[in-house]
Swiss-Prot record:
PANTHER family, per database record: LEUCINE--TRNA LIGASE, CYTOPLASMIC, LEUCYL-TRNA SYNTHETASE
Record gene name: leuS
Keywords recorded for this protein, A-Z: Aminoacyl-tRNA synthetase, ATP-binding, Cytoplasm, Ligase, Nucleotide-binding, Protein biosynthesis
SUPFAM superfamilies per UniProt: Anticodon-binding domain of a subclass of class I aminoacyl-tRNA synthetases, Nucleotidylyl transferase, ValRS/IleRS/LeuRS editing domain
Catalytic reaction equation(s): tRNA(Leu) + L-leucine + ATP = L-leucyl-tRNA(Leu) + AMP + diphosphate
Signal peptide: none
UniProt protein name: Leucine--tRNA ligase
């Protein structure tokens, strides 16, 4: 057969779908009970979509196609996200001829040179990639209703008005507030950064350090060394301080409010602190070695403690000043032990080694399972020898911190007897009230780089607008909604619950980037994770909005709060529709239609996206829905998918290790790409794209096409007499239907592909082997029937070639709208399946005997099936599942008593193997029917149950495990 022209077939059916408007649902066609509304996070248009994105968008398309075939009225719309700073940042970098950016867009995304330089204008980037993304989705065969297409920002005024309405609504509820809050900040551009504005480090947490002001008296001056800690309660156990002798530190005037103090911190810390409500005036810079050997006073205990050298102190983490609590911090304990061995370092700084030798650890916390100094014990338990054992040290630290926080009891007055969790808060609060401690925010990991290419800092912003996700009443409603939602996979539910718990105020607007201006404060632009939470509701009316725009009958400015309130939040009212019609110029009937559309399609049945959006978009989606819509309109389910890698490596545009979705389609065909990414892993697991494997799959898909094309020429005559192997094939087809259906209902795409494609293909291969040489009406009936079912099972995964094959089969209309196969009751036949499994197993056993026994030129095999009494034992054991009960029952039978010892051994064996589900078959009948096939497969003569006991094997025969002698 000539190589299949995937592209020609794809273009043919994409054109036909578009012409027939197959995927534009009419709400009047089916009752609300038969509607199915599924959406996926719309793509951000800063570049081409890659094969990782392909997974995210193919999953909902497969589910949409499956539900459509099940008879549902399916809405699967698509829009485009262009809000925020990233696109503006790209334009800026192209304008500045940034080599890395130029490389990505010219060499990785293959943007023609003459178009690339137009990208200095962000709108040109949007225009180019919006067109490219839509073409990619069409080429992929996505069953999208394109009449509802839109994009975000003020560049699309109707949607912008919708977002204004959303924010007015939230503000009226007290959920959008103004105030001071910590945010990730680009210090060069001067803007807050949301998750989508971060190029590297978007998952990095912000930590809240307590900085405790240790006192250095020098030349009549009081200078503070603020030590940063996540465990303020351990200030009572400080034995020394750590500074990095090679790092640069500064002495600076630090002003906060009406207070001015002298601080010594790392140079990096001084810069970062300047963004956190402090004025910093650097007086001098010096190396940390200048302070080594000096003493500072603990502001809580009054103890004088020495400053010791430590290269492990990172000047770019918090203040660069670290307090040492060796009884409860494994790093501190091991650093002191190392220092005791390296006396030359101490002598370098004129420190008497005995000072370090005589440091006494201070025990603060009682912890079950540990003695006085848990850090020492844990380091010993994990075999930590020195600071070089970094992984073990980090594990020891995690173990101790976690155990002490959750189970530790404080021993030091005035907090003796209280849990560490409580003491931590009390100590921090008391120190801050006394002015001896403050808060500093720091990233848990580095680097955090904005999409402008700049290192981010944490800034305290005043007069910033926030969505108050910390509101307790709002959190309660979000939890209620989540509890009533289906989450796939269910294991992700705990992550959603945790995010709801820790979510707090989130900056929702910034001063730069594309977007919708905040309606009451237009200097601010609503950011990308805040204008993308309820657009699924907008899809329900966007067809009408788009039609009005097309006809020049829409004045978007007139789409005010009253209009959207009526559509989305109020009961039907003819009077209201008339008033709104007069106000907006939109016909009252159209307004009524819009409301009908929303009420029909909502609630959203499924929201799909990748797992990285759980801590932001997907949880914001829940919050905003419960705030704005009636409970009956709250979303019903979220499906979360994993990521993709390329040839075992994480995809990276900058390293060129990326495969564009459209290139994958060009290389392999859309159907092959779809089937490959759906069959590689379950939707919630990560997958790895391997070109070699895709090539193999292409050949299998071509074989599928070839087989069905041949079967399409057969006639399926009714009333034919089927043989057992024919019944087996139809039974297995039933199993494939059942398995694929169940898997798709649960978004288990890999399992669905296994059933719909590989299982049918493998079963068909076996059937063709078993029926080789036959060309009768029964076989033709089975193969023609199989083709009809198989094409429909494959339609959600490989829609283009399935349409082509459906046409060859003479199917009615589009296979995309054909009924999804259902198991045929009369096809079920567990007996023929058991018999066929028996035959397969026997063939493999005989092959193994020949190989293991090294029998050269075998001539014949003698097969002995189990006697009736052994089957009786199997049946009784299956019923009783207990040795004594089974033995008692069987010994009632005189025939069984003749085999007493053998019965006893057999019962023991069956119970040990838990062989309780053995299905009885007529083994001899199955063997005689398959005798010719077995002989052909093995190339030897088969003799079934002869009188003579060749090789004394007869007694070894067991139910479903015949005894075999080969000669």
């Amino acid at each position: 057969m000539a190589e299949l022209n995937f592209k020609a077939i794809e273009e043919k059916w994409q054109k036909r779908w578009m012409e027939a408007r197959v995927f534009e649902p009419d709400r009047k066609a089916k009752p609300k009970e038969k509607k199915f509304y599924i959406t996926v996070a719309f793509p951000y248009l800063s570049g081409h979509l890659h094969v990782g994105h392909a997974r995210t968008y193919t999953i909902p398309d497969v589910i949409a196609r499956f539900k459509r075939m099940q008879g549902y009225n399916v809405l699967f719309p698509m829009g485009w996200h262009i809000t925020g700073a990233p696109i503006v940042g790209i334009a800026e970098r192209i304008k500045n001829r940034d080599p890395k950016t130029i490389h990505i867009y010219r060499d990785v995304y293959k943007v023609p040179e003459e178009i690339l330089w137009k990208f200095e204008d962000p709108k040109e980037i949007v225009k180019y990639f919006m067109k490219a993304a839509k073409e990619t989705f069409i080429r992929a065969g996505f069953s999208v209703d394109w009449t509802r297409e839109f994009h975000t920002t003020s560049l699309f005024p109707p949607f912008s008005k919708f977002i204004e309405w959303q924010f007015w609504t939230l503000k009226d509820m007290g959920l959008v507030v103004k105030g001071a809050h910590r945010v990730r900040w680009d210090p060069v551009v001067g803007t807050p950064l949301g998750d989508h504005d971060i190029m590297e480090g978007e998952d990095v947490q912000i930590l809240e350090y307590v900085i405790i002001k240790f006192i250095l008296e020098e030349n009549g001056e009081t200078i503070y060394l603020p030590a940063a800690t996540l465990r303020p309660e351990t200030v009572y156990g400080v034995t020394n301080m750590w500074l990095n002798p090679e790092a640069t530190y500064v002495k600076a005037k630090v002003r906060k409010g009406d207070r001015e103090e002298l601080w010594i911190v790392s140079k990096e810390a001084a810069y970062k602190l300047s963004f956190q409500d402090r004025e910093i005036e650097v007086i001098e810079e010096f190396k940390g070695e200048k302070l080594i050997g000096k003493y500072v006073k603990n502001p809580v205990t009054g103890d004088e403690v020495i400053i010791l050298p430590a290269e492990f102190v990172d000047p770019d983490n918090a203040t660069g000043v670290v307090m040492s609590v060796p009884a409860h911090a494994p790093f501190d304990h091991i650093a002191l032990e190392d220092l005791k061995k390296e006396t030359e370092i101490l002598l370098k700084y004129d420190i008497d080694p005995r000072v370090v030798e005589e440091i006494s650890y201070i025990s603060l916390i009682s912890l079950e399972g540990y003695g006085e100094f848990p850090a020492v014990e844990e380091a010993e338990r994990l075999g930590v020898k020195s600071q070089k054992d970094k992984e073990k040290l980090e594990q020891a630290t995690k173990n101790i911190y976690k155990a002490e926080y959750h189970k530790g009891i404080f021993k030091i007055e005035p907090y003796a007897g209280k849990p560490v969790q409580e003491v931590k808060e009390l100590v921090a609060k008391e120190m801050m009230e006394k002015g001896i401690a403050e808060i500093m925010y720091e990233f848990a990991d580095k680097p955090v780089i904005s999409r402008f290419g700049n290192q981010a800092v944490i800034k305290i912003i005043h007069d910033q607008w926030f969505i108050d996700y910390g509101n307790p009443e709002w959190k309660a409603k979000a939890r209620e909604a989540l509890a009533n939602m289906t989450i796939y996979p269910e294991s992700r539910r705990a992550q959603f619950e945790a995010v709801i718990d820790w979510l707090d105020k989130k900056a929702c607007a910034r001063k730069v980037g594309l977007g919708t201006p905040l309606p009451w404060d237009p200097d601010w632009v609503i950011e990308s994770l805040s204008d993308s939470t309820i657009y699924m509701a907008y899809y329900t009316i966007s067809r009408h909005i788009n039609q009005l725009r097309k006809e020049g009958k829409l004045d978007a400015e007139k789409l005010d709060r009253e209009f959207f309130d009526y559509i989305f939040r109020e009961p039907f009212s003819e009077e209201k529709e008339r008033k709104l019609s007069e106000k907006t110029g939109i016909p009252a009937e159209t307004i009524h239609e819009m409301k009908e559309e929303f009420e029909y399609w909502y609630p959203l049945d499924w929201r799909c996206s990748a797992k990285d959006l759980i801590p932001n978009h997907l949880t914001f989606f829940i919050f905003n829905h419960v705030a704005i819509f009636d409970k009956k309109h709250w979303p019903k389910g979220i499906a979360v998918n994993g990521f993709g890698t390329l040839e075992g490596q994480k995809m990276s545009k900058s390293k060129g290790n990326v495969l564009n979705f459209i290139d994958a389609i060009e290389e392999n065909g859309a159907d092959v790409v779809r089937l490959y990414i759906m069959g590689l892993a379950e939707h919630d697991s990560d997958f790895d794209w391997r070109r070699k494997e895709v090539g193999k799959l292409r050949k299998q898909v071509e074989r599928f096409y070839e087989l069905v094309s041949e079967f399409a020429t057969y006639e399926a005559k009714e009333g034919v007499e089927l043989k057992d192997i024919d019944r087996w094939m139809l039974h297995r087809l039933n199993k494939a239907i059942e398995g694929a259906t169940k898997a798709l209902e649960e978004f288990r795409t890999r399992t669905a592909v296994q059933w719909a494609f590989y299982t049918v293909l493998n079963d068909l291969r076996w059937y063709l082997r078993r029926t080789e040489g036959r060309d009768d009406d029964a076989k033709r009936y089975v193969l023609r029937t199989l083709a009809d079912v198989w094409v429909r099972l494959m339609a959600p995964f490989t829609p283009h070639i399935s349409e082509e094959l459906w046409e060859k089969l003479g199917g009615e209309g589009f296979v995309s709208l054909a009924p999804w196969p259902e198991p045929v009751p009369e096809w079920w036949n567990e007996t023929v399946e058991a018999e066929e499994d028996f035959v397969k197993s026997l063939i493999e056993d005989i092959k193994e005997i020949i190989t293991v026994a090294k029998i050269e030129n075998p001539k014949r095999a003698y097969i002995y099936t189990a006697p009736e009494w052994k089957w009786r034992v199997v049946e009784v054991v299956a019923e009783k599942r207990d040795f004594k009960a089974a033995m008692a029952e069987l010994m009632k039978d005189p025939e069984m008593r003749k085999h007493g010892k053998e019965v006893s051994k057999l019962i023991q064996r069956l119970i040990k193997e838990r062989a309780f589900e053995v299905k009885r078959i007529d083994e001899e009948k199955a063997l005689r029917e398959a005798k010719d096939f077995i002989e052909k497969e093995l190339g030897i003569e088969i003799i079934i149950n002869p009188e003579e006991d060749r090789g004394g094997k007869k007694k070894q025969a067991m139910p479903l495990k015949p005894a075999v002698f080969v000669e």
